[in-house]
From Swiss-Prot:
One of its GO terms (cellular component) is cytoplasm. It catalyses: ATP + H2O + a folded polypeptide = ADP + phosphate + an unfolded polypeptide. It is found in: Cytoplasm. Together with its co-chaperonin GroES, plays an essential role in assisting protein folding. The GroEL-GroES system forms a nano-cage that allows encapsulation of the non-native substrate proteins and provides a physical environment optimized to promote and accelerate protein folding. The gene is groEL. GO terms for biological process: protein refolding. It comes from Campylobacter jejuni subsp. doylei (strain ATCC BAA-1458 / RM4099 / 269.97). It comes from the Bacteria. ATP binds at residues 29-32, 50, 86-90, 414, 477-479, 493. Belongs to the chaperonin (HSP60) family. One of its GO terms (molecular function) is ATP binding. PANTHER family: 60 KDA HEAT SHOCK PROTEIN, MITOCHONDRIAL. This is Chaperonin GroEL. Its EC number is 5.6.1.7. Keywords: ATP-binding, Chaperone, Cytoplasm, Isomerase, Nucleotide-binding.
């Protein structure tokens, strides 16, 4: 297919048109008074959202060059959401402002490479200043404030996330699911839970709840299938003498071995239960090792030269209780040593930092949560499916932003932190580098300007008032239309969100500004289908047999 090559200002101007169209669609969602965007779906009802990244992902432009510009900024919004959980609209608005201002200067004759160098230096200085301005999240109230702002000022969601984080800790896993009612709920599973249920309903001890409940059990961990009971007999005899329950976690328990365990359970000889080990392959081995460390036991593994016959009571783990239903097993208060658990947690954290696979990262985070304090499930309720999707998006955003706040701290929100950071930096640059730095500094006003515009206020007056305020915590509360102490009013942002949004915006804008040529496919208009209306006279063929 033939390609079209466009150079210099003409190429950059076309790219800018695409960025502008994307920005115009996304920026209306910004701030507490941001508007909704209605998105047509290929099937079903349209979706309504106030989430910047959801809007950005839907923007697909007809002109291929404009679409190239839009798709680069769309990628920035998406990347910002992945890294920080929020700040997608901020990143888009900043990228547009930097590109617009930079384009004007480059068209007037500035050197794009020098301009880029100045932009990078300014960005570095502002990020350093943001880190200085940040402060730790001190309590549940501040967690709720961050979550509320990221959930588009929904206090109920903010409080729900704060409750969840308080119960499972900052390393705990918090998942978001759709509720079956219109009410929001929070369910917390304490201890380690994995998705394997009892191997036989005959193990059930609580017929009303259909669960197996074992009090202070021993836990045997084996990484292969158990088919022959003879291998198990030595350890079963030792358990019988103690009078305590036993939970067996193995790859599988088959045939005669399972049948004999069930018979012993029914006769009251042993209080016993068995479940399959969670996961598959290498992940199964890792999770068995996690359970061993949590319960103070050892995995009996033939790879390490151990056989099931050689297992003793000293190899078994212990816990204060184990609850098993048909789908899940929960181990509460494992008897493992805290130092060993902490070492395992740090090992998994290091693996999370190194992995490049999103799937592996998700599974490692699940293992981390299971070891460090449980899982919280936020169930989101709504009256309609459209409302449910929109609300679930907001809860996901708020959750990620809250984790970012706990990780790196908070700064004042509402676009004010970028303006305060700008006022503190002093760069000694010359020529086009100085122009590049000035472009970034001017663009830092764009988020606050947009928040004020969306709320119906004079953006110039608002920006000027915040810039000239004597108290460095003063900002603009767009919901009330007042200048307030942002920290006292609970209008705060995670510093990670501001930092990532700025870095990504400068990165994409400088890429676009240093673009000197674009190559795109020439769309060929397909010929229209021939008009069939002139064939109406074929009725005369009716005499054919």
């Amino acid at each position: 297919m033939a390609k079209e090559i466009i150079f210099s200002d003409e190429a950059r101007n076309k790219l800018y048109e695409g960025v502008k169209k994307l920005n115009d669609a996304v920026k209306v969602t910004m701030g507490p008074r941001g508007r909704n965007v209605l998105i047509q779906k290929s099937f079903g009802a349209p979706s309504i959202t106030k989430d910047g990244v959801s809007v950005a992902k839907e923007v697909e432009l007809k002109d291929s060059l404009e679409n190239m510009g839009a798709s680069l900024v769309r990628e920035v919004a998406s990347k910002t959401a992945d890294q920080a959980g929020d700040g997608t609209t901020t990143a888009t608005v900043l990228a547009h402002a930097i590109f617009k201002e930079g384009l004007r200067n480059i068209t007037a004759g500035a050197n794009p490479i020098e301009v880029k160098r100045g932009m990078d230096k300014a960005c570095e200085a502002i990020v350093a200043e943001l880190k200085k301005l940040s402060r730790e999240v001190k309590d549940k109230k501040e967690i709720a404030q961050v979550a509320t702002i990221s959930a588009n000022s929904d206090e109920k969601i903010g409080n729900l996330i704060a409750d969840a984080m308080e119960k499972v800790g900052k390393d705990g896993v918090i998942t978001v699911e759709e509720a079956k009612s219109i009410n929001d709920e929070l369910n917390v599973v304490e201890g380690m839970q994995f998705d394997r249920g009892y191997l036989s309903p005959y193990f059930i001890t609580n017929a009303e709840k259909m669960t197996v409940e074992l009090s202070s059990p021993y836990i045997l961990l084996f990484d292969k299938k158990i088919a022959n009971l003879k291998d198990l007999l030595p350890v079963l005899e030792q358990i019988q003498k103690t009078g305590k329950p036993l939970l067996i976690i193995a790859e599988d328990i088959e045939g005669e071995a399972l049948a004999t365990l069930v018979v012993n359970k029914l006769r009251g000889v042993l209080n016993i239960s068995a479940v399959k080990a969670p996961g598959f392959g290498d992940r199964r081995k890792a999770m068995l090792e996690d359970i061993a460390i949590l319960t103070g036991g050892e995995v009996i593994s033939e790879e390490l030269g151990r056989t099931l016959e050689s297992a003793t009571i000293q190899d078994l783990g212990q816990a204060s209780s184990v609850i098993i239903d048909k789908d899940n097993t929960t181990v509460v208060n494992g008897a493992g040593e805290k130092a060993n658990i902490d070492a395992r947690v740090n090992q998994i954290k290091a693996q999370i930092a190194e992995t490049t696979s999103d799937y592996d990262r998700e599974k490692l985070q699940e293992r981390l949560a299971k070891l460090s304090g449980g899982v919280a499930v936020i169930k989101v309720g709504a009256a309609t499916e459209t409302e449910m999707k929109e609300k679930k998006d907001r809860v996901d955003d708020a959750l990620s932003a809250t984790k970012a706040a706990v990780e790196e701290g908070i700064v004042i929100g509402g676009g004010a932190a970028l303006i305060k950071a700008k006022a503190k930096i002093k760069l000694d640059l010359q020529g086009d580098e100085a122009i590049g730095a000035a472009i970034v500094e001017r663009a830092l006003r764009a988020p606050l300007r947009q928040i004020a515009e969306n709320a119906g206020f004079d953006a110039g007056v608002v920006v000027n008032s915040v810039e000239n305020a004597k108290d460095e915590n003063t900002g603009f509360d767009a919901a009330k239309g007042e200048y307030v102490n942002m920290l006292e009013s609970g209008i705060i942002d995670p510093v990670k969100v501001e930092r990532v949004a700025l870095l990504n915006a400068v990165s994409v804008a400088s890429m676009l500004l240093t673009t000197e040529a674009t190559i795109s496919e020439i769309k060929e208009d397909k010929p229209a289908m021939p008009d069939m209306s002139g064939m109406g006279g074929m009725g005369g063929m009716g005499g054919m047999m």
